[in-house]
């Protein structure tokens, strides 16, 4: 066991997570069609503050993230402060760590709490796959800049005459890694082939995710942590996530064709997480501040870790790398955990990470550790379903996982929970949570 790193303030206070909330998650171009991420962020933070009944002036910092950036609102965090009635002097800045963005936001607020610069803050993220920054070609962009500097109409017309019809076509946001040109699904296919993850195994995990998420909603387990969203023109509210297929059968998954490697692939739209719109946020404060305000925390942040690996091959192994580090810093092992919640970007990626967490060879030869991190107990793993079912608004997923895990830990009488995710760029994140 390596060095334990307690997450406490100089006064010995633990980092308390006192409340968490999210919007329902909606598939791209459905319920939240036309609503930008900044509005989703305002929606969830405003409701979170209203439900918590914490005076706005108590919140000293807001750290928020957005992966699909909109040029007109580059600092989503500050726009949320200004648009929710929070104290105008509240410090606010934005972060981005791809699919682990709200993990990063939580870590940043925790670090401010430990440094003593604040006593309470909000962390979270929002993304919209329905409101996208549609760009223009590089040639058109250059011409537009030059036209802006041209002094006469003839100069402007001459510049425009250089353009061809193809130069006027809109350019959608990139779906591939900037450094490699690989799509996430291509990497998932790599992992499936390298580690022998079959189509049947992937479909089974996806089906399990949907069934458990549907059961969680049916049992009323999510009602406290998911707000009702009222959407213009306000005819019908969105109450639940609209991606969950509770009535599907395993046979339904087998009907879909591969989405990335059309000829030999096993990754399909059904065993991958869909493009999604939504927002989520949590309130963090020092343990003593929570006591002063008479608040009972959902739980505490015990440790966190971020890692990075090469992007050319199997880059979605973030959980396999970050989990042992987070556990080490918490002074725990896999067997100490009550719950394990892993982001399901793809069923193939999830199953490959589970495989490596239990691999002695990977631990010795790749991580340089004496023993495997540990086998993942299925009875503890993604017990309420995962991202394949709920959806994945990139910057919001981490806050969803944290809130969901803490509520479930409390229902079980407390314990330790691990939340972990892969992210674009070969990044990984893991956090250990504690509930009493």
From Swiss-Prot:
PANTHER family, sorted: ACETYL-COA ACETYLTRANSFERASE, CYTOSOLIC (PTHR18919:SF107), ACETYL-COA C-ACYLTRANSFERASE (PTHR18919)
Keyword Thylakoid carried by entry: no
Gene: fadI
Catalytic residues (positions): 99, 392, 422
Molecular-function GO term, any one: acetyl-CoA C-acyltransferase activity
Pathway, per record: Lipid metabolism; fatty acid beta-oxidation
Oligomeric and partner information: Heterotetramer of two alpha chains (FadJ) and two beta chains (FadI).
Family matches, as Pfam families: Thiolase_C, Thiolase_N
GO BP terms in the entry: fatty acid beta-oxidation
Catalysed reactions listed for this entry: an acyl-CoA + acetyl-CoA = a 3-oxoacyl-CoA + CoA
GO cellular component term, pick one: cytosol
Biological source species: Shigella boydii serotype 18 (strain CDC 3083-94 / BS512)
KW Cytoplasm (keyword) present: yes
Family membership noted in the UniProt record: Belongs to the thiolase-like superfamily. Thiolase family.
Compartments it resides in: Cytoplasm
InterPro entries per the UniProt record, alphabetical: Ac-CoA_C-AcTrfase_FadI, Thiolase, Thiolase-like, Thiolase_acyl_enz_int_AS, Thiolase_AS, Thiolase_C, Thiolase_CS, Thiolase_N
Protein name as annotated: 3-ketoacyl-CoA thiolase
Class of the enzyme per the UniProt entry, highest EC level: transferase
Function: Catalyzes the final step of fatty acid oxidation in which acetyl-CoA is released and the CoA ester of a fatty acid two carbons shorter is formed.
EC number: 2.3.1.16
UniProt keyword list: Acyltransferase, Cytoplasm, Fatty acid metabolism, Lipid degradation, Lipid metabolism, Transferase
């Amino acid at each position: 066991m390596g060095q334990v790193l307690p997450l406490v303030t100089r006064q010995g206070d633990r980092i308390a997570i006192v409340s968490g909330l999210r919007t329902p998650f909606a598939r791209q171009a459905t319920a939240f069609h036309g609503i930008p991420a900044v509005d989703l962020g305002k929606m969830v933070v405003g409701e979170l503050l209203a439900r918590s009944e914490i005076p706005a002036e108590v919140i000293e910092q807001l750290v928020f993230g957005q992966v699909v950036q909109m040029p007109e609102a580059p600092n989503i965090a500050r726009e949320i402060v200004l648009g929710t009635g929070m104290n105008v002097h509240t410090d606010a800045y934005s972060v981005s760590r791809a699919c682990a963005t709200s993990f990063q936001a939580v870590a940043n607020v925790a670090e401010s709490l430990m440094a003593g610069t604040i006593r309470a803050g909000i962390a979270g993220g929002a993304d919209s796959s329905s409101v996208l920054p549609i760009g223009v070609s590089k040639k058109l962009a250059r011409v537009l800049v030059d036209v802006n500097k041209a002094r006469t109409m003839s100069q402007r017309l001459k510049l425009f005459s250089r353009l061809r019809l193809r130069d006027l076509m809109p350019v959608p946001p990139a779906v591939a890694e900037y450094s490699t040109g690989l799509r996430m699904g291509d990497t998932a296919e790599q992992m499936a082939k390298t580690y022998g993850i079959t189509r049947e195994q992937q479909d089974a995990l996806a089906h399990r995710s949907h069934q458990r998420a549907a059961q969680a909603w049916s049992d009323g387990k999510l009602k406290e942590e998911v707000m009702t969203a009222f959407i213009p023109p306000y005819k019908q509210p969105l109450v639940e996530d609209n991606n969950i297929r509770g009535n599907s059968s395993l046979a339904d998954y087998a009907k879909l064709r591969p989405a990335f490697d059309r000829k030999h692939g096993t990754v399909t739209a059904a065993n991958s997480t869909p493009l999604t719109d939504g927002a989520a946020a949590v309130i963090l404060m020092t343990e003593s501040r929570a006591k002063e305000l008479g608040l009972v925390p959902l739980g505490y942040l015990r440790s966190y870790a971020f890692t990075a690996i090469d992007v050319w091959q199997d880059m979605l192994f973030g959980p396999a790398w970050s989990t042992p580090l987070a556990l080490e810093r918490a002074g725990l092992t896999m067997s100490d955990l009550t719950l394990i919640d892993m982001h399901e970007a793809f069923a193939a990626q999830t199953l490959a990470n589970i495989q490596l967490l239990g691999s002695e060879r990977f631990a010795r030869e790749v991580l340089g550790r004496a023993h495997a991190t540990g086998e993942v107990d299925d009875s503890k793993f993604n017990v309420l379903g995962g991202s394949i079912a709920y959806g994945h608004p990139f910057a919001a997923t981490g806050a969803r996982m944290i809130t969901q895990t803490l509520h479930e830990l409390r229902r079980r009488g407390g314990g330790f929970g691990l939340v972990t995710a892969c992210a674009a760029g070969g990044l990984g994140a893991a956090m250990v949570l504690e509930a009493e």
